[in-house]
A protein has these predicted regions:
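A detector for small-residue-rich transmembrane helices and their helix-helix packing motifs
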Residues: 1-224
């Protein structure tokens, strides 16, 4: 842990502390996940600060484990290349961008499905629309993590990676492209409760930021 770059290490620590703090607070009747998770912007529980705080909330152990594993594996490399300030900026912008895309997707869904109703029939019965909208909460660092994956694939496109269950190494750029295509297909064709378009949003904002930095520094190819 002492060998980790500063921002990567602190991101891991903060996320883990928030995760365990969430469960401790629950025992005292405090729902931190609801307070800090990202609500739909038309819901009464929404506030702008949630675009940052939602990144530090996670739904369960597997959720935080895989996100933090990716931060540890790829984030430390990016921080060593970019430095702490640029890496933290990138991480936060990807996470915020993912949240904005999630809000946009939910808004489109709201306009096409819910906007003409005053209440919604759920598993718990019929509830008012405002109460239903407050249930639409997004949590997790996955948007920022997908931005990290994109950046790694752009900075080190030909790095060899072993990905289960593929029996042979693949280049990082193909790994990233494959993940993006998978997220798009899942976003279009599944209803699994995962914010797939938010993941793509993190990658999109990461791409925009990297291209901007490249042009600001004198241009050149996106991949090197």
């Amino acid at each position: 842990m002492n060998n980790l770059p500063t921002v990567t290490k602190n991101l891991l620590i903060i996320n883990v502390l928030c995760f365990f703090g969430m469960f401790v607070a629950r025992k005292y009747g405090v729902d931190i996940e609801n307070m800090l998770g990202l609500h739909f912007f038309l819901a009464s529980d929404f506030n702008l600060g949630q675009l940052i705080t939602y990144m530090f909330m996670h739904a369960n152990f597997s959720h935080i484990f895989f996100n933090m594993f990716a931060v540890w594996m790829f984030g430390r490399v990016l921080e060593q290349v970019w430095g702490p300030k640029r890496f933290l900026t990138y991480y936060l912008i990807c996470g915020i961008g993912a949240g904005l895309i999630q809000e946009l997707v939910q808004y489109v869904e709201y306009l096409t499905v819910w906007s003409n109703y005053d209440s919604v029939n759920t598993r718990l019965g019929i509830i008012p629309m405002d109460a239903f909208l407050n249930q639409l909460t997004t949590v997790g660092a996955s948007g920022a993590v997908y931005g990290i994956l994109l950046a790694f694939g752009m900075l080190f496109p030909n790095s060899q990676m072993f990905v289960f269950p593929i029996p042979m190494p693949i280049k990082a750029k193909y790994f990233v492209i494959g993940y993006a295509v998978l997220e798009l297909l899942l976003g279009l064709g599944s209803n699994d409760g995962v914010a797939h378009f938010a993941h793509l949003g993190g990658m999109l904002f990461g791409l925009i930021l990297i291209v901007y930095w490249r042009k600001k520094n004198g241009g050149g190819r996106i991949y090197y």
